[in-house]
UniProtKB/Swiss-Prot annotation:
Motif ('KMSKS' region): 596-600
Entry function: Catalyzes the attachment of isoleucine to tRNA(Ile). As IleRS can inadvertently accommodate and process structurally similar amino acids such as valine, to avoid such errors it has two additional distinct tRNA(Ile)-dependent editing activities. One activity is designated as 'pretransfer' editing and involves the hydrolysis of activated Val-AMP. The other activity is designated 'posttransfer' editing and involves deacylation of mischarged Val-tRNA(Ile).
Domain of life (superkingdom): Archaea
Pfam entry (one): Anticodon_1
Family: Belongs to the class-I aminoacyl-tRNA synthetase family. IleS type 2 subfamily.
Protein name, per record: Isoleucine--tRNA ligase
Record gene name: ileS
One GO cellular component term: cytoplasm
Amino-acid positions noted as binding ATP in the UniProt annotation, renumbered to this chain: 599
Molecular function terms, GO-annotated: aminoacyl-tRNA deacylase activity; ATP binding; isoleucine-tRNA ligase activity; tRNA binding; zinc ion binding
Length: 1049
């Protein structure tokens, strides 16, 4: 049976009790078993890295997922909802290196790769367990007992199988490419793993001496002096105009410089030349015959064997000098041009970011970025430095260790994504994107520029590339499964990680031994295969056939170039189609000012801090309702507080009828609203809750969680708490088992039982708590959990839009009447004789007049016919500029007449065309000579609403005063009942002493009403009473002093 609940919503207590209930009853698994056999809904959890505690962004991400999955479950769907964990890669390695105090790969090798791998595995598993508990504390339901983990052998097989598929399709190749390189981690990193921020770097103009022409130089500009030792060519644009310029220095000497014509002034200013003349101009293509020398060739012996030429390139821009320094070993565009022109791919830099012996003895062993000043000095000593300075620009850094990246040419493994680009663009058109522009614009743009995917990494903790190469003949095999590997190796392989898999040798068809390449997969390849790996494919082909592809995924907008992209690329390789049907892209979490959360700024908000202060349901509802999912969330403590306040109001609305229901032994047999003659307000709230369900369904179909939750919030605050509860409250105080009271109980029960089901996906704890008491308390045969209930849906036959519209006008009129009362100095507790409603439209409020009377506390509600107004007073003002020219010297008399007469009489005279008679003279007054303004009588106070004006009659009679004082006394006694913490049905004895005999006489006639309202067995009212009681308080109302004493009867 139902029980009363505490007066204040305590989220910690509620959520702890619900967690214990879910755990004790194994509710999650019961829900999943209940829905098994329903229509399938395959969700793939974008796996977070197991590197630390969750942050506000990951909390928001999981709340979005959980809310959608809970909703789909209540709609009857059979969910595939395995939690996912990304447990490989640099994110884990760097954390473990920090823990062990390692600074480089050399430290790992010395420590032992096997021991390092075990440390990584232990760290990843330990963090997974901690993060699981954090997500659970938010009420997130996923299959936590059976998550997919990228470190498991069965998951690794999915990646291996996919790479073998790439090999079979001719999409896997190995080659020398320029890649983003982290010299600390000593591995290639993906474009999406490069983080950019502003940094200061050298900005230098360098002169390359032209061969065969004395004192003539090609001028280039660069921010990477360390790449000059690797320069092999320069590039110009075929359509740009270039010039040979004789430029004079202050000492009278000159040089001949070659640069873009439009940039001469700026370049010479940088070099502090004092004058110049253009010797000749030509197009870029006319420079192709020139050759030059690298100014550092005496320090870099390899440069002496390179013929340095000028080449054409479309990527050259009309900036700096209009000529680009080309180092194919250190630039993406440089590399592409190098392949096209068959230039040497000269890269004298090792994996640790230090110059190799190819850079010459002077530079060998030096870290390239540290060598910038030395290279600049060497250029200056050789007369090759035209100008130098500093430039602040955006520069890329390793996403994990924050080291500035460099570009170097290394041998890597690639998947030919560029060959699949057109197919990928077609596939994304089949996907439903939320919002649409996430796919049609942002993702489409990214795919349109897709390059081949560098899948290899020179690290340890990752999925090993399943590529074995014969040491004898160079043949290559790609292994697709553990079973295939064991069959080829002739022995079991228990762990597919390094170093165990490194020791596996295969027999080549030539008789030689095949060894595995040492690289591991790019960690993005791990999560790229999630949609089939989570189905245990390729081991379980039937599960894959039944469920794949995913019905829904959602992640932040950075995953446009991350997980959304890697999944699509891998799936196109493996299956030739997109791995997902619908994608919701959500935003980032920022602070209230729109700044990224950062420890250095001190603006980080931890989800556990919000939960500690306001509870998990508040955090959930706040992040869902604050803005559209695809917009960035600007976290506000005030916003979270307002949501908490809303949940408090919901709790009070739920709590309100409980004492009365308990007292009256209300049971489920009385909860059928069809048994009662419902009032219009009952039918209205039932209509509203059905309209609410309809709105939520429409919004959830487009993943507009913000609209769904805002509709709930508006219903709770406006419809339920501020309106219906106020309308129904007096009916719950009726002593007898009155049908009208039971109708109110039944309506409240049905509305609340529907509301908690609508709230369940978003505030699962509070919804469960209310459901267990209110619904299960009345009906033990109801489903065991609110999350085992079917989605309530809506009944069109119960939605009455006409009634909803009429009630909205009633609410507007009530608010306008309250505003008029305030202007007229009449408190709402004091009754008024009448309100008058004037509108140009026909308002059908007949069925709601009783609501208007009670909510405006008026004895009569008058609705005037359309266009009519109450009888008004008229004010008149003369238009002097119209009177003067007509009446000239008599104008003063005319104005005196108009302002002295009754304005209504003046108006009658003008409308009738009669002359105005004044002091024996007649004057013809026309309409333009006066202006009339209608004003209500002093007792009628107007206030506007959307359809017209409400007039409140604030005149007082003794009867109205008597009722007003009676209501004031009732309110004080009710407050004192709360102070004494009395139960609803406890009777009291009351004494009321007033210092006004007039008010004593007025109130005495309301003695029975006051006693009934406050449940008093004895009520004494007088002027000079001897007061005794448990609690006595003094009050003052409109100058009348009141002393009230209350005691239990």
């Amino acid at each position: 049976m139902i029980v009363e609940v505490p007066g204040q919503y305590n989220p910690k207590n509620v959520e702890d009790e619900v967690r214990e209930f879910w755990h004790r009853e194994d509710t999650y698994h019961k829900v999943r078993r209940l829905r098994s056999g329903g229509r399938r809904f395959f969700f793939v959890d974008g796996p977070p890295y197991t590197t630390g505690r969750i942050h506000l962004g990951t909390a928001w991400n999981k709340v979005i997922k959980d809310s959608i999955l809970r909703y789909m479950s209540m709609r009857g769907y059979d969910l595939k909802d395995r939690a996912g964990w990304d447990m490989h890669g640099l994110p884990i390695e760097v954390k473990v290196e920090e823990h062990l105090g390692f600074r480089s790969k050399r430290d790992i090798e010395s420590y032992g790769v096997d021991r390092f791998i075990e440390q990584c595995k232990s760290f990843a598993l330990r963090q997974k367990d901690e993060m699981t508990e954090q997500f659970k504390s938010l009420g997130v339901w996923l299959d936590w007992d059976n998550p997919y983990m990228t470190l498991k052998n069965e998951y690794i097989e999915a990646a291996w199988w996919t790479l073998k598929r790439a090999h079979e399709r001719g999409l896997l190749e190995r080659g020398l490419r320029v890649v983003n390189w982290c010299p600390r981690c000593q591995t290639a990193i993906a474009d999406s793993e490069v983080e950019y921020w502003d940094e200061s770097d050298p900005s230098i103009y360098v002169k390359f001496p032209v061969e065969g022409e004395d004192n003539t130089y090609i001028v280039i500009w660069t921010t990477t002096p360390w790449t000059i030792p690797a320069n092999v060519a320069v590039a110009v644009h075929k359509d740009f105009m270039y010039s040979k310029v004789r430029a004079w220095r202050r000492d009278g000497t000159y040089e001949i410089l070659i640069m873009a014509t439009d940039l001469i002034e700026n370049v010479l200013k940088q070099g502090r030349y004092v004058d110049y003349e253009i010797l000749e101009s030509m197009r870029g293509e006319d420079l192709l015959s020139l050759t030059y020398k690298n100014p550092l060739q005496d320090l870099v012996p390899a440069q002496r064997d390179i013929v340095h030429r000028v080449h054409l390139a479309d990527f050259v821009t009309a900036e700096n000098t209009g000529i680009v320094h080309i180092a194919p070993g250190h630039g993406l565009e440089d590399y592409e041009l190098g392949l096209e022109k068959r230039l040497p791919i000269f890269c004298p830099v090792g994996e640790d970011g230090r110059y190799t012996s190819e850079a010459g003895k002077k530079y060998e062993g030096k870290y390239v970025r540290d060598a910038n000043p030395e290279v600049v000095e060497d250029l200056m000593e050789r007369g090759a430095l035209l100008a130098s300075g500093e430039l602040v620009h955006r520069y890329g850094h390793c996403w994990r260790c924050k080291t500035p990246i460099i570009f170097i040419a290394t041998r890597q493994w690639f998947i030919g994504i560029s060959e699949l680009r057109d197919q990928m663009l077609k596939e994304i058109e089949r996907v439903s994107w939320y919002p649409d522009w996430a796919g049609s614009a942002r993702f489409k743009d990214w795919i349109s520029n897709a390059r081949d995917w560098c899948i290899s990494r020179q690290r340890y903790w990752g999925i090993p590339l399943p590529i074995w190469i014969c040491r004898s003949c160079g043949a290559m095999d790609v292994i697709g499964t553990a079973a295939e590997l064991e069959a080829r190796a002739g022995r079991p392989v228990e762990d597919l990680h390094r170093p165990a898999v490194d020791d596996v040798r295969l027999r080549c068809s030539c008789g030689g031994a095949m060894e595995r390449v040492p690289d591991v997969f790019d960690v993005w390849f791990d999560s790229a295969v999630a949609s089939w790996a989570t189905l245990n494919f390729p081991r379980d082909e039937e599960e894959f056939r039944v469920w794949w592809p995913a019905d829904f995924i959602t992640e932040g907008h950075d995953q446009t170039r991350g997980w959304f992209y890697s999944q699509l690329g891998a799936s196109m390789v493996a299956f030739g189609r997109a791995p997902y049907k619908s994608v919701l892209m959500h935003g980032f979490t920022l602070d209230e000012q729109g700044r990224k959360m950062s420890k250095s700024i001190g603006n980080v908000v931890h989800p556990e801090d919000v939960v500690e202060r306001y509870g998990a349901d508040t955090l959930r509802f706040y992040v869902l309702s604050s803005n559209a999912p695809w917009e960035d969330l600007h976290f506000s403590w005030e916003g979270a507080m307002n949501v908490n306040r809303m949940l408090n109001i919901l709790w009070n609305a739920y709590r309100f009828p409980l004492p009365y229901m308990v007292l009256d032994r209300f049971d489920i047999s009385k909860a059928d609203t069809s048994k009662y003659d419902l009032r219009p307000e009952d039918r209205w709230i039932i209509s509203r809750v059905n309209s609410l369900a309809k709105e939520i369904e429409e919004n959830m179909s487009g993943y507009m969680l913000h609209r769904a939750t805002r509709s709930l919030q508006e219903f709770v605050l406006e419809d339920l708490s501020r309106w219906y509860i106020q309308l129904v409250r007096p009916r719950t105080w009726i002593e007898t088992e009155d049908p009208d009271k039971l109708a109110a109980y039944a309506t409240l029960y049905n509305v609340m039982s529907t509301l908690v089901k609508l709230m369940a996906p978003f505030t699962p704890f509070l919804a469960e708590s209310i459901y267990q008491n209110l619904v299960r308390g009345l009906d033990p045969s109801a489903p065991e959990s609110v999350h085992m209930c079917d989605w309530p849906g809506y009944r069109e036959d119960l939605i009455d839009k006409g009634l909803e519209e009429s009630m909205s006008y009633v609410r507007e009129i009530s608010e306008a009447a309250a505003n008029a009362r305030q202007k007229g100095g009449r408190k709402l507790r004091w009754p008024v004789s009448r309100i008058i409603i004037a509108s140009d439209e026909q308002l059908d409020l007949r069925d709601l007049l009783h609501v208007l009377r009670t909510q405006t506390n008026s004895k009569e509600v008058i609705i005037l016919p359309p266009g009519e107004k109450p009888e008004m007073n008229l004010e008149i003002s003369v238009v002097q500029k119209k009177i003067g020219p007509v009446f000239k010297g008599e104008s003063r008399d005319v104005v005196e007449a108009l302002t002295s007469m009754n304005p209504k009489e003046v108006k009658r005279i003008i409308e009738s065309g009669e002359p105005l008679e004044w002091k024996g003279r007649s004057y013809m007054i026309t309409e333009e000579m006066v202006e009339f303004r209608e004003i209500p009588p002093a007792n009628l106070i107007p206030a506007e609403f959307s359809k017209g004006t409400v007039y409140v009659d604030v005149s007082l009679t003794d009867e109205l005063r008597a009722e007003g004082y009676a209501r004031e006394i009732i309110r004080r006694i009710q407050d004192m009942r709360k102070d004494l913490d009395l139960k609803v049905d406890e009777m009291i004895r009351v004494s009321v002493a007033l210092n006004s005999n007039e008010v004593v006489d007025l109130v005495s006639g309301w003695r029975d009403y006051i006693s009934s309202e406050v449940r008093a067995t004895l009520l004494r009212i007088g002027n000079d009473l001897d007061l005794e009681g448990e609690l006595t308080k003094d009050w003052e109302v409109d100058g009348v002093k009141i002393r009230v004493s209350v005691a239990r009867a």
